[in-house]
């Protein structure tokens, strides 16, 4: 499971997930990618489950890049605890994902294999996602420049 080696503070505020992703929304490393369409917290377990599903499905071929990292601690209070007496202890880590963010990238495989592997990883995610390829991204860039 992914988690930071050390953090400045043990606990964090929950924060808000408004707007679209400002960074990490273009394909950088691979040729195919999985893009988030909704805002959500994605746990380190979910990230790992998606990564495993992709590697199993790709079978040696290709390379996978995980583009999100769980850097936010989520605190949970013990069961049957009365109100008050401070905030709970950090239980697990999440990555804050906004719409447009690339979750996984894949390269070195055919489009058919990539689509199948990424769709299996998408089923492990708690949000709606879409499969994108670098060719589609290039086309959208050129159409934006023309207009």
UniProtKB/Swiss-Prot annotation:
Compositional bias annotation for Basic residues: 1-17
Principal subcellular localisation of the protein: plastid
Tagged with keyword Chloroplast: yes
GO CC terms: chloroplast; mitochondrial large ribosomal subunit
Disordered: annotated span: 1-20
GO terms of molecular function: rRNA binding; structural constituent of ribosome
GO biological process, one term: mitochondrial translation
Domain of life, source organism: Eukaryota
UniProt KW Transferase keyword: no
Keywords: Chloroplast, Plastid, Ribonucleoprotein, Ribosomal protein
PANTHER family in alphabetical order: 50S/60S RIBOSOMAL PROTEIN L16, LARGE RIBOSOMAL SUBUNIT PROTEIN UL16M
NCBIfam families: rplP_bact
Protein name: Large ribosomal subunit protein uL16c
Gene transcribed to yield this protein: rpl16
């Amino acid at each position: 499971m992914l988690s930071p080696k050390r953090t400045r503070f043990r606990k964090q505020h929950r924060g808000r997930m408004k707007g679209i992703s400002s960074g990490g929304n273009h394909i950088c490393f691979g040729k195919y990618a999985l893009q988030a369409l909704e805002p959500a917290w994605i746990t380190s377990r979910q990230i790992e489950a998606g990564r495993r599903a992709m590697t199993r499905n790709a079978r040696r071929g290709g390379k996978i890049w995980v583009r999100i990292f769980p850097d936010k601690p989520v605190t949970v209070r013990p069961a049957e605890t009365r109100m008050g007496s401070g905030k709970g202890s950090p239980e697990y880590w999440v990555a804050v994902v906004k719409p447009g963010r690339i979750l996984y990238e894949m390269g070195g495989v055919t489009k058919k294999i990539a689509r199948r592997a990424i769709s299996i990883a998408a089923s492990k995610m708690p949000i709606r996602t879409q499969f994108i390829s670098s060719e589609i991204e290039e086309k959208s860039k050129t159409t934006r420049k023309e207009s």
